[in-house]
Each structure stands twice: as C-alpha cells, then as structure tokens.
Amino acid sequence: MLFLLPSRYCEVDSELEALSGTLFGQSQPGWQRVQAICNFVQQHIRFDYMQARANRTALETYRERTGVCRDFTHLAITFCRCLNIPARYCAGYLGDIGVPAAPYPMDVSAWFEAYLGGQWYAFDARHNTPRIGRVLMARGRDAADVALTTTFGVNQLESFKIWTDEIQKDFLTRPFGSLAEAW
C-alpha cells in the first residue's frame, strides 16, 4: 500500500524504524498505538513558527526537537509507517471552534489520517486533542504531494486571512430556500 512506503519527508528506512519499535512496540495495536505516537510527538517537539523550514524531514524533526505542524505530522506518519500502520498527510485549515482562540493568525494546518480497522481516522500530533472545524484541502504521502500553492516568477504575498465560523444547529434545520435569507 502506498501509505506504508517511505516518502520525501517520511524516511521509513531510517533510524526511526528501530526507535519506533522501542517506543511503541508495547502499546496496544490500533487506535491506542497511534495515540501513543501522537502523545510522544507532541511532547518531544516544540512548536515554533520561527523555526519553520520547508525541507525538514521526519528524522531531522526528531533530532532537532522543533518545528511546525507539518513537522509534527511527518514524524507521526513515519512512526506509523514504521509500525506497518498506513498513514497519509492531510493539509487544510483548522479553526478555533470549540477551543480558545490562538494568539496568532489562523494558517494552513497539517494533520494525518491512519488506516485502522478498514477505515481512515484523523489524528493531530501537533494539537493532540479532538478538534472540530477542519477544512481538508488535500491528502498525500507527505507535504511534497500536497503543495497548497505553487508560484512562478517573482512574487510577494501581500495579505492572507483565513477564518471559520461555527454554523448553529438551528441554521442547519431551515428549509433550503431560507439559506439565502441568512446572508
């Protein structure tokens, strides 16, 4: 299966393979093992926007102990694959619905899905807590497969703003014709 193989940022054939058995081999298989991976990654890596580097691999993330959500995700995916758990990279937006607002602007986010018991489940090693409001943009083996922007020539981003709003339950129960009235 494609999501068990090494990829550009998830080097399954590295020292992480031996480490994964030591760290997680005694965990209960399935969901508990993937959650143990998320727990470890979230505790081992320090989130720091200022340390973002687009070409950081899972092994470098493990050694440097710092990174952004894509780095947390690559390391967790690599551990899963090392333990024969198919895992794929997800990129999109993650708002602050149901949690305190973050002190920094909303940005593109990364999480992963693990294939357990015949279906894919979302995990987030960076936040390591269930969240609502994910807006999935792309899936792939790692970040190399799912570039959210590709530019050509000289350019400079002038502004970038993302927001999500929770839709109230009563709004969802209105007849279709009344949707236009809400706007």
List each language-model region with its residue ranges:
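Secondary-structure boundary elements
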Residues: 1-67, 75, 143, 155-175, ...
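Hydrophobic/aromatic-rich core segments of domains that either
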Residues: 39, 71-159
